[in-house]
Amino acid sequence: MSLSTEAKAKILAEFGRGENDTGSTEVQVALLTAQINHLQDHFKEHIHDHHSRRGLLRMVSARRKLTAYLKRTDAERYTALIQKLGLRR
């Protein structure tokens, strides 16, 4: 259920600050969002997959914490990221 290498590279190129930026908050939130969207499609077919649903909830929680951190530290980057990813806030 993980993302392909090409998908990760595309996200890194779009949201990263530099060529090898894999740890910035924007990149982490974008990767989590892609994984969450992928899992949502999985759950449409596999309704009773509770083990993966727990992983999904952990990812959503991690994304929420990272976005809260970004909002607290740099509100401009936060609003730009939320608009770019199409998240509710």
UniProtKB/Swiss-Prot annotation:
Molecular functions per Gene Ontology: rRNA binding; structural constituent of ribosome
Any GO BP annotation: translation
Coiled coil start-end: none
Keywords attached to this entry: Ribonucleoprotein, Ribosomal protein, RNA-binding, rRNA-binding
Annotated SMART domains: Ribosomal_S15 (SM01387)
Top-rank lineage group of the source organism: Bacteria
GO cellular component, one term: cytosolic small ribosomal subunit
CDD domains, per the entry: Ribosomal_S15p_S13e (cd00353)
InterPro entries: Ribosomal_uS15, Ribosomal_uS15_bac-type, uS15_NS1_RNA-bd_sf
Record's function text: One of the primary rRNA binding proteins, it binds directly to 16S rRNA where it helps nucleate assembly of the platform of the 30S subunit by binding and bridging several RNA helices of the 16S rRNA.
Family: Belongs to the universal ribosomal protein uS15 family.
Subunit field text: Part of the 30S ribosomal subunit. Forms a bridge to the 50S subunit in the 70S ribosome, contacting the 23S rRNA.
Record protein name field: Small ribosomal subunit protein uS15
Organism: Shewanella sp. (strain W3-18-1)
